[in-house]
């Protein structure tokens, strides 16, 4: 739903090395749009609470990469034949400096907390460089802004954000520009979508460990288009597991049955005042990704 914040946990088959801990950094890929500023607002407030550092990352491309990127993507500059690489780089630096100045103004006015942040530029394909940086630096979370409900449905998440969500091993929090929340402490109820896969339990543990300093209730939901007794049996088993594993967490359990799964989910979100949707992005091979 357009009014909800989308949180995606990407859990893959490979195990994270136990000796490597995630850094106390929050990564914000920015494209100088209004929804980038919304992501900054949320991230800066989270960084204040978690005593974290914010990294603003912008990825630009030169004509070398132009043919590899889709038209109309919010991260792209339109490159004319008359533009030189030098001009492109100057434009990127100018835009990033303008963003930094705008953030400084918001810090001075008190709209943003005064926390440590830095700006980084990388050349390449946006989603690839975002994922590469996340793999290298291991931030605690990636926060990305998305378009609001006045935009076309296909644009709500955006191709770059969707690709990062699909492939990232780091939690990705996508913030619609029209979301009323300014910080995570305002979130009161989270929906966690499960397919009764064991990886969902791993994803939930990672999700819980990331946000356990906040207070919220969780709705564990399964989406289906037909009645299946096994769903009820599996749900009963999950109830028992979560009761033992998370005794202090308020959890609701529901099976949503609707011929139109997205319509059923949207209605559930409205009826139950869900603030964030959490889901697991399973690792798929190249053929599954294509088809």
Predicted regions and their residues:
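Intrinsically disordered or low-complexity boundary/linker segments at protein termini
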Residues: 1-41, 112-114, 140-152, 156, ...
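Structural beta-alpha unit
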Residues: 1-4, 10-21, 61-64, 90, ...
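Small/aliphatic-rich secondary-structure junction motif
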Residues: 8, 18-82, 188-252, 274
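A short acidic, glycine-rich active-site loop
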Residues: 76-94
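Short secondary-structure boundary segments
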Residues: 146, 222, 280-282
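Charged helix-capping and loop-helix junction motifs
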Residues: 157-160, 233-238, 290-291
């Amino acid at each position: 739903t357009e009014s909800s914040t989308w949180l995606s946990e990407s859990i893959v088959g490979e195990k994270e090395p136990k000796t490597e801990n995630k850094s106390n950094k929050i990564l914000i890929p920015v494209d100088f749009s209004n929804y980038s500023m919304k992501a900054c607002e949320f991230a800066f407030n989270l960084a204040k609470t978690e005593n974290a550092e914010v990294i603003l990352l912008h990825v630009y491309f030169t004509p070398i990469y132009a043919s590899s990127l889709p038209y109309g993507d919010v991260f792209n500059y339109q490159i004319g034949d008359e533009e030189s690489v030098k001009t492109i780089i100057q434009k990127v630096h100018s835009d990033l400096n303008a963003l930094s100045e705008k953030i400084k103004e918001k810090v001075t006015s008190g709209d943003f907390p005064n926390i440590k942040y830095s700006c980084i530029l990388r050349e390449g394909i946006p989603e690839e460089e975002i994922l590469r940086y996340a793999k290298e630096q291991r931030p605690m979370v990636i926060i990305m802004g998305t378009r609001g409900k006045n935009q076309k449905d296909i644009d709500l998440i955006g191709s770059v954000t969707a690709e990062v969500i699909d492939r990232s091993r780091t939690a990705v929090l996508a913030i619609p520009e029209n979301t009323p929340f300014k910080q995570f402490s305002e979130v009161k109820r989270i929906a966690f979508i499960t397919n009764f896969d064991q990886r969902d339990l791993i994803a939930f543990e990672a999700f819980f460990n990331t946000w356990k300093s906040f207070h919220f209730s969780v709705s564990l939901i399964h989406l289906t288009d037909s009645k299946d007794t096994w769903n009820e049996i599996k749900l009963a088993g999950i109830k028992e597991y979560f009761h033992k594993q998370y005794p202090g967490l308020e959890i609701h359990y529901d099976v949503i049955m609707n011929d139109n799964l997205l319509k059923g989910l949207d209605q559930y979100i409205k009826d139950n005042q869900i603030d964030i949707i959490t889901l697991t992005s399973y690792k798929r091979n190249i053929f599954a990704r294509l088809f």
